[in-house]
Swiss-Prot record:
Organism: Hydrogenovibrio crunogenus (strain DSM 25203 / XCL-2)
Higher taxonomy: Bacteria, Pseudomonadati, Pseudomonadota, Gammaproteobacteria, Thiotrichales
Function description: An accessory protein needed during the final step in the assembly of 30S ribosomal subunit, possibly for assembly of the head region. Essential for efficient processing of 16S rRNA. May be needed both before and after RbfA during the maturation of 16S rRNA. It has affinity for free ribosomal 30S subunits but not for 70S ribosomes.
Family: Belongs to the RimM family.
Database matches in InterPro entries: PRC_barrel-like_sf, PRC_RimM, RimM, RimM_N, RimM_N_sf, Transl_B-barrel_sf
Superkingdom of source: Bacteria
GO biological process: ribosomal small subunit biogenesis; rRNA processing
Gene designation: rimM
Domain PRC barrel, residue spans: 100-177
Record remark: domains: The PRC barrel domain binds ribosomal protein uS19.
The name this protein goes by in its record: Ribosome maturation factor RimM
Subcellular location: Cytoplasm
Keywords associated with the record: Chaperone, Cytoplasm, Ribosome biogenesis, rRNA processing
Length: 181
């Protein structure tokens, strides 16, 4: 099912504990560096399949930046904070700063990938960080089942063109390199 723009949310982390007695929460952040999650407010917090909005009153990195704690408006004691453990934290796409050029990785998810020969390779389902180069996981349903292709994200070598507006990526890659899942 496709979601409308208004339904799109960007998951930035999760509340994974409580900190102190005044309602502070521990955060597992997906941002890099981890404390960048504190740059965004308000947060959308998913509580029992419903998104609630919270202003971030304060926040800081702990343990040399390895963890993050935050104080959210309206959560003023340890017992109330405990109710939010396990809840996802998200923001709306318009809260992201505009990129001067380029794009955010999350904008590549769902893009249709075609080879220079015009062959449909499938859709980007994931971006895998490998250390050397990030890798696009592209999946396509075929008669033999789900075909998964890993394509190194190396501009001008394998990735020839990215158009996030039309959700299209052109690559110099062939399906013979694919593996079935």
């Amino acid at each position: 099912m496709m979601s409308s723009k208004q339904d799109e949310k960007i998951i930035l982390g999760q509340i994974n504990g409580i900190y102190g007695v005044q309602g502070w929460v521990k955060i597992f952040s997906h941002t890099d560096p981890r404390q960048n999650i504190l740059s965004y407010s308000p947060w959308l917090v998913k509580v029992k399949n419903e998104w609630r909005t919270f202003q971030v009153e304060e926040g800081r990195a702990q343990q040399g930046g390895k963890s993050v704690v935050a104080k959210l408006e309206g959560i003023d004691d340890r017992d109330l904070a405990r109710e939010y453990i396990g809840c996802e934290i998200a923001i709306l796409p318009e809260q992201l700063p505009a990129t001067e050029e380029g794009f955010y990785w999350m904008q590549l998810i769902g893009c249709q990938v075609t080879s220079v020969e015009g062959e449909d390779l499938g859709q980007v389902t994931e971006i895998v960080e490998t250390g050397a180069h990030d890798v696009l996981r592209v999946e396509k349903q075929s008669d033999a089942g789900l075909v998964s292709t890993l394509i190194p994200f190396v501009m001008e070598t394998f990735i020839l063109d990215v158009d996030v507006e039309s959700k299209q990526i052109q690559v110099d890659w062939q399906l013979e390199d694919a593996t079935e899942s």
